[in-house]
């Protein structure tokens, strides 16, 4: 595998999320609407690492999973703008793209969060084994711990 300029490249194995953060302007009142602001951003440990590698000028592939929903389109468009290559990402047509929702209190501390990351379970050893050629050609591979690439198993999949 090589990129269009035949430069050394990195592969990041990990998740990508749509992060939705809500911050209350006043102390939170349980079981009530709280005035505040809501912001949407892209996150996920794998995506964040890939983003920073691109900022350093490193051609980077992200091995991740996205669903067949509108959130996947947001992920793909953002990664394209950043130069993160998703051409080898796992697409799960009936899956939900990972989404993380958190509510922060008026002091900026997280009060509660919900993580819909079930799609990360699709990042299996078989999926990574199917990417062997890409992984073998990489100058560097970064694997986030929940991606089933445990240290004692790595040689079997990479």
What is the predicted function of each stretch?
Residues 147-154:
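Conserved small/polar residues in nucleotide/adenosyl-binding loops
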Residues 63-65, 89, 144:
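Structural motif
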Residues 91-92, 102-140, 145:
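Conserved phosphate-binding/catalytic loop of the ribokinase/pfkB sugar-kinase fold
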Residues 157:
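Cationic, low-complexity basic patches in intrinsically disordered or flexible, solvent-exposed regions
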Residues 83-93:
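A glycine-rich helix N-cap at a beta->alpha junction
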Residues 1-65, 70-74, 80-84:
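Glycine-rich phosphate/adenosyl-contacting loop at the front of the ribokinase-like
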